[in-house]
């Protein structure tokens, strides 16, 4: 499981680097879509099946349409790729190298704690004698309607504002 999450985190950061170093709008959208899908797989890997599915459906349902529309408006006959400009490609390779260096430095201390599981008492569905059973699907529904309500409102508002920002940028 650790190797699975490590590979997913490297792919997630690679997608984020691809987004940050976009030579053409098509590849920026591709990097964002890859990062979003792999982020949802990371949520699934930590046991959040409902939350991972909801984020995946909302993300692909909403933002994929926006990126498809904007890349259709900003198409070029010969788009520049990541490998066509050595300056951009060198930053991409440098970013990947820095990811590996940071991971190596964190693994030297053996004190890497990705997720803090100390305050899970609120999320237990059924508890007998200090043993709690956690249902993943129900936890996702509870998280959306309890503590993540404002986060969902902010995410929806960000998507709504992002549509207008992208349309204004690509408008003639």
Swiss-Prot record:
CC per GO annotation: mitochondrial inner membrane; mitochondrion; respiratory chain complex I
Membrane association type: Multi-pass membrane protein
Alphabetical UniProt keywords: Electron transport, Membrane, Mitochondrion, Mitochondrion inner membrane, NAD, Respiratory chain, Translocase, Transmembrane, Transmembrane helix, Transport, Ubiquinone
Chain ranges passing through the membrane: 1-21, 26-48, 52-74, 86-106, 147-167
Physiological role: Core subunit of the mitochondrial membrane respiratory chain NADH dehydrogenase (Complex I) which catalyzes electron transfer from NADH through the respiratory chain, using ubiquinone as an electron acceptor. Essential for the catalytic activity and assembly of complex I.
The gene coding this protein: Mt-nd6
Lineage: Eukaryota, Metazoa, Chordata, Craniata, Vertebrata
GO BP, one annotated term: mitochondrial respiratory chain complex I assembly
Pfam families: Oxidored_q3
Keyword presence, Transcription regulation: no
Reaction it catalyzes: a ubiquinone + NADH + 5 H(+)(in) = a ubiquinol + NAD(+) + 4 H(+)(out)
UniProt record similarity statement: Belongs to the complex I subunit 6 family.
PANTHER family the record matches: NADH UBIQUINONE OXIDOREDUCTASE SUBUNIT ND6, NADH-UBIQUINONE OXIDOREDUCTASE CHAIN 6
GO molecular function terms attached to this record: NADH dehydrogenase (ubiquinone) activity
Subunit structure: Core subunit of respiratory chain NADH dehydrogenase (Complex I) which is composed of 45 different subunits.
Protein's recorded name: NADH-ubiquinone oxidoreductase chain 6
């Amino acid at each position: 499981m650790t190797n699975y999450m490590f590979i997913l985190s490297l792919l997630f950061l690679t997608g984020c680097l691809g987004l940050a170093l976009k030579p053409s709008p098509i590849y920026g959208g591709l990097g964002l879509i890859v990062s979003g899908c792999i982020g949802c797989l990371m949520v699934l890997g930590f046991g959040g099946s409902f939350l991972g599915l909801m984020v995946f459906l909302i993300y692909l349902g909403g933002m994929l349409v926006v990126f498809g529309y904007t890349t259709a408006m900003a198409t070029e006959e010969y788009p520049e790729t990541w490998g066509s400009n050595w300056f951009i490609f060198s930053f991409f390779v440098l970013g990947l190298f820095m990811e590996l260096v940071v991971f190596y430095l964190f693994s030297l201390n053996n004190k890497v704690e990705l997720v803090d599981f100390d305050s899970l008492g609120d999320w237990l569905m059924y508890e007998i004698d200090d043993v709690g059973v956690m249902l993943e699907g129900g936890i996702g529904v509870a998280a959306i309607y309890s503590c993540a309500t404002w986060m969902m409102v902010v995410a929806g508002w960000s998507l709504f504002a992002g549509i207008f920002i992208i349309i204004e940028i690509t408008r003639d």
